[in-house]
Each structure stands twice: as C-alpha cells, then as structure tokens.
C-alpha cells in the first residue's frame, strides 16, 4: 500500500476542511486560505487520533494531484485550489496554452453546451492540460466526456486565466462558443 493510499481518508477529510468546511474541525482560514499547521494537527486528532505533522507532511508530499501546499516557513497549509469558500489565492494572470480540456460526466453535457462551463460552488472553472487528466476528472462524476476549450480565443477576447500551484488552469467561466465536445464515450 502506497503512502497516498495509506492516508486516503485523512487526505479526503483534509481536502474538505481546507477547501470547504474548516469549521468541521473548529479551525479558520485566513483570507488567502491558509490554516495554522499546529492548530490543524491538534484539531484533526479529534477525528484521526494518531494524526501528526509527519502524516500531514506525507499527505502533502505524496498527493498525486498536489492539492496542498505549505507556506515557506512550514507553519501554514492550504489547498492549492478548489475552494467553495471566498479565499484569495494571490494568483497572477497567465497566458494560457492554445487549448485546455475539461472533463465532466455525460449527464452534464446538454447543460454545458447551452450555458458553458460555470464555476458553480467553486471560485473558478478548472481546466486540465491534457485529455488524460480531464478524463480522470470526468470519471469521478460518472461516465466521462471531454470538452476542448479554445483558450487562445478566450484569452484574446479578454478572459483571464490563472495557473494554480499544482498545474490546474483556472478561469471564471467558459462560454459555449469556446467549447468543443471531443470525447463522448
């Protein structure tokens, strides 16, 4: 069993806490999404009694999606993106590649073709660099389908893009005219 698999429950709960519900363990995030490591560990022990700094460091180091980051002095931790809470990640606008991809479940295709990609409860729409990653994302929600996003045209039209610390591209919305359904399994 890999270290990532070993701490899967803790990692999923950490994601919930740092992205959506810090109050679930009685902590708060600052305006940039950071939580104090010592307070987080202390309060995580209520749900996972053996939780420790070593386990937290293993989760951060082995997470295949690089969901989390420590502050430079390792006293704080945050999720790299995916928040439903209002946080400012201090990301700078970036020029995106010519195209990016978005994976979703087939049941959402009709709505997306009509209304485009919306951030829903998150702060941004998440886009992937490649079809394989987008397919994995889509498969989490059911039968996956992939949209190709014409990010070059979007950027030229004034849409702003950000690149998160773990390589996920973020934007506020993707109107239907910039979408092309490329995989419909």
Regions found by a protein language model. Give the residues of each.
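Eukaryotic, polar/proline-rich low-complexity intrinsically disordered regions
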Residues: 1-185
């Amino acid at each position: 069993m890999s270290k990532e698999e070993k701490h899967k429950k803790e990692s999923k709960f950490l994601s919930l806490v740092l992205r959506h519900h810090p109050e679930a363990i009685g902590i708060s995030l600052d305006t940039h999404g950071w939580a104090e490591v010592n307070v987080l560990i202390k309060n995580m022990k209520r749900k996972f009694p053996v939780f420790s700094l070593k386990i937290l460091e293993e989760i951060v180091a082995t997470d295949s999606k690089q969901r989390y980051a420590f502050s430079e002095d390792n006293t704080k931790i945050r999720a790299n993106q995916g928040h439903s809470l209002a946080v400012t990640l201090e990301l700078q606008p970036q020029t995106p590649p010519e195209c990016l991809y978005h994976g979703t479940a087939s049941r959402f295709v009709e709505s997306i073709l009509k209304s485009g990609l919306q951030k829903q409860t998150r702060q941004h729409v998440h886009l992937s660099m490649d079809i394989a990653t987008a397919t994995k994302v889509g498969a989490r929600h059911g039968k996956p389908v992939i949209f190709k996003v014409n990010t070059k045209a979007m950027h030229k039209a004034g849409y702003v893009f950000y690149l998160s610390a773990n390589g996920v591209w973020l934007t506020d919305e993707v109107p239907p005219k910039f979408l092309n359904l490329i995989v419909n399994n």
